[in-house]
Amino acid sequence: MLLAIDVGNTNIVLGIFAGHELKCHWRVASDRQKTADEYGLILRQLAHYQGLDLKEIQGVVLASVVPTLTQVLTEMITKQLGHQPLVIGPGVKTGMPIRFENPREVGADRIVNGVAVYELYGGPAIVVDFGTATTFDAISEKGEYLGGAIAPGIGIATDALFARAAKLPRVELVRPPRLIGKNTVACMQAGIMYGFIGQVEGIITRMQAEMGGKAIVVATGGLAGLIGPEVNCIDRVDPMLTLEGLRIVYERNT
């Protein structure tokens, strides 16, 4: 079995693959204060509840945008599983040409998403990853990573509105029943949700035009299930796209 780990600023997503099949996955908070031993305990508890034997894990692949957690999790994997993880970064074979001014600047998760979307859906394609930040990544018809855009995530926008407007309460991030709100909370939810949707649709539409025509648009990330269905120009919602990309890259390096 293969353990795939996607380390983000807010959450860590772990998945267990048996061949090409994703057997199970978990989402835990990204906590920079936790030690390797604490993360090891979490992994063992999750595996126990799932009825999995960690001794069956034959390889580990990891993509991270949090350097401190990369070190902690690498130590945890070495101690708990006896494996050296494949950490996505320079020198790792992805099979995807990077048409970026400085390829080392591209986040590991964005590269992995690009690999996955081209392998699973073909190109040209656009990946929208709804996480702490919202990233848009363009993949050519030939499978080249072309670049993209980075915008604040909807959670950041919500926190900023609450923090900077003294009389506005903190609200739950949910789809409002209508655009025209009838109370302060509903008005905030409508403005946050539909303002964000408009931003996403605008960036996708302009990106497609810059790419010369129609590109398949795939949404992923922790908030893809909430926001993806509301965006008219998103074709597919695939919350496990990053884990699939990690599996694909691992296979290309073994």
Swiss-Prot record:
Which co-factor is required?
NH4(+); K(+)
The subcellular location is:
Cytoplasm
Name the GO terms of the biological process aspect: coenzyme A biosynthetic process
Classify the source by domain of life: Bacteria
Q: Look up keyword Cytoplasm and say if it applies.
A: yes
What GO cellular component entries does it have?
cytoplasm
Main location per the UniProt record: cytoplasm
Which Enzyme Commission number(s) are on file for it?
A: 2.7.1.33
Q: Where does K(+) bind?
A: 129
Per the record, what are the reactions this protein catalyses?
A: (R)-pantothenate + ATP = (R)-4'-phosphopantothenate + ADP + H(+)
Print the keywords alphabetically. Answer: ATP-binding, Coenzyme A biosynthesis, Cytoplasm, Kinase, Metal-binding, Nucleotide-binding, Potassium, Transferase
Q: Which residues form the active site?
A: 109
GO molecular function of the protein, one example? Answer: pantothenate kinase activity
Its annotated function is as follows: Catalyzes the phosphorylation of pantothenate (Pan), the first step in CoA biosynthesis.
Q: Subunit arrangement?
A: Homodimer.
The family line of this record is: Belongs to the type III pantothenate kinase family.
Q: Which NCBIfam families match?
A: baf, PRK13318.1-6, PRK13321.1
> What is the protein's name according to its record?
Type III pantothenate kinase
Q: Which organism is it from?
A: Moorella thermoacetica (strain ATCC 39073 / JCM 9320)
Identify the gene encoding this protein. coaX
